[in-house]
Swiss-Prot record:
Family: Belongs to the peptidase A31 family.
UniProt-annotated binding residues for Ni(2+): E22, D68, H99
Lineage: Bacteria, Pseudomonadati, Pseudomonadota, Alphaproteobacteria, Rhodobacterales
Keyword Transferase set for record: no
Domain of life: Bacteria
Gene Ontology MF terms in the entry: aspartic-type endopeptidase activity; enzyme activator activity; metal ion binding
Keywords: Aspartyl protease, Hydrolase, Metal-binding, Nickel, Protease
Protein's job: Not known. Could be involved in the processing of hydrogenase.
NCBIfam families (UniProt xref): hupD, hydrog_prot
Origin species: Rhodobacter capsulatus (Rhodopseudomonas capsulata)
Entry protein name: Hydrogenase expression/formation protein HupD
GO biological process assignments: protein processing
């Protein structure tokens, strides 16, 4: 029997699917629901960029697994796993967006209130591109989704939680209109909808379009 066997686990994906690789975490939980059957005590949640609104979910969990795009300073597409005290430290070391600052605050607040999960695991991927509004995950990052899920499954099994191939029904995931397949098919092209900024305000955009 494992030394640590949590009764309630939160598997959380955070980020913004509208900003290219920043959607990595959300796409991981979406994919995990499609490929693995999780027991009732494991909750899959698309946390998006909700910040402190995620606090009640952390309060309920004894263990936490977080998927996110994190700037570790490594080669783009590199997958990294951090645990426990290293999780808030790495999420705040080099902030890429407001959602990371917000999630740091969530962890700090949960710790102050005495409700922080006793085990935390961050499965992060070094992004390639974050400035493409409406863009897709880059191949180097998208290619790490299944490996990130496999790492989460290993972590869950190490905690004594049974995970099998299958599917998990959850009401806590991305809206179907923003699911990856629908998003990719329904998104307008770059010619139809500029994704690099209005040239009236962003000189770099004008140079690219010239």
């Amino acid at each position: 029997m494992p030394a640590f066997k949590p009764e309630r686990v939160l598997v959380l994906g955070i980020g913004n699917v509208l900003w290219a690789d920043e959607g990595f975490g959300v796409r991981c939980v979406e994919r995990m629901a499609e490929t693995h059957a999780l027991p009732a005590n494991v909750r899959l949640l698309d946390g998006g960029t909700q910040g402190l609104y995620l606090l009640p979910f952390l309060e309920e969990a004894e263990a936490l697994i977080v998927f996110d795009a994190v700037d570790f300073g490594f080669t783009p597409g590199t997958l990294v796993t951090m645990r426990d005290d290293d999780v808030p430290a790495f999420m705040g070391a080099k902030k890429m967006s407001l959602h990371q600052t917000g999630f740091q605050d969530v962890i700090a607040t949960a710790q102050l209130m005495g409700y922080c999960p006793s085990r935390m695991t961050l499965i992060g991927c070094q992004p390639v591109e974050l400035e493409d509004y409406g863009g897709s995950l880059r191949p180097a990052v998208a290619g790490q989704i299944d490996f990130a899920i496999a790492e989460a499954v290993r972590e869950l099994r190490a905690w004594g939680i049974e995970v099998t191939k299958g599917a998990t029904i959850s009401n806590d995931l991305v809206d179907p209109s923003l699911a990856r397949d629908a998003y990719e098919r329904g998104r307008p092209s770059e010619d139809e909808a500029c994704r690099i900024g209005d040239h009236r305000f962003f000189p770099s955009a004008a140079k690219v379009r010239a």
